[in-house]
């Protein structure tokens, strides 16, 4: 995939790992199928793409930006397989930055409530983002601005920015509220 993209694009100096699966499970009820899907899509694919990007890219001003999740900073027992795969992606961000420097800078973005997931009602999503410190939904453009920031700042690597309206610090998670996500 990396070789194909490089052959088709005039400039290819940035890989953004954004694909993700987000299914709810817990330690008590996760199954092998969901576990494998989460690890394959959320961690294995970015690892392989990052490896191939590092092998096939020239020059020094190259970037990998991993879209992680604020959940890596505010752990809950919900979305067990998803959270483990995203904490793995967080670690991949750090370790691949060390491996690929100085040719490739690797950073991450940990968004909060940006888009309503397919299982949520509009009301539940609204309650979710209103429970953040800033009481607002994250705008996709704010995430795009962070991508632009990482690309333009050549001295930044191994950083993960939370763009989560303060969710990772103050979100009233279901485990705290004794509720159900």
Please state what every model-predicted region is.
Residues 18-23, 166:
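Conserved NAD(P)H cofactor-binding loop of Rossmann-fold oxidoreductase domains
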Residues 1, 16, 49-53, 57, ...:
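Hydrophobic positions on the long internal alpha-helix
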Residues 90, 100-114, 156-163:
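Conserved Rossmann-fold SDR core element
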Residues 11-13, 56-68, 102-104, 159:
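Active-site loop of short-chain dehydrogenase/reductase
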Residues 63-88, 93-101, 113, 167:
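Catalytic loop of short-chain dehydrogenase/reductase
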């Amino acid at each position: 995939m990396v070789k194909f993209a490089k052959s088709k694009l005039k400039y290819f100096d940035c890989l953004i790992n954004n694909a993700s699966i987000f299914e709810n499970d817990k330690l008590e009820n996760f199954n092998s199928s969901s576990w494998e899907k989460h690890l394959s899509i959320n961690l294995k694919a970015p690892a392989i793409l990052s490896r191939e990007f590092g092998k096939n890219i020239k020059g020094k001003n190259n970037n990998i930006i991993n879209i992680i999740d604020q959940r890596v900073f505010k752990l809950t027992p919900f979305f067990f397989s998803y959270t483990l795969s995203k904490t793995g992606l967080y670690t991949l961000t750090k370790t691949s930055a060390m491996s690929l420097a100085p040719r490739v800078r690797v950073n991450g973005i940990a968004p909060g409530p940006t888009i309503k997931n397919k299982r949520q009602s509009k009301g539940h999503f609204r309650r979710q983002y209103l429970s953040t410190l800033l009481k607002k939904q994250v705008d996709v453009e704010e995430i795009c601005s962070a991508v632009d920031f990482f690309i333009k700042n050549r001295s930044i690597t191994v950083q993960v920015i939370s763009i989560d309206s303060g969710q990772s610090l103050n979100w009233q998670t279901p485990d705290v509220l004794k509720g159900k996500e």
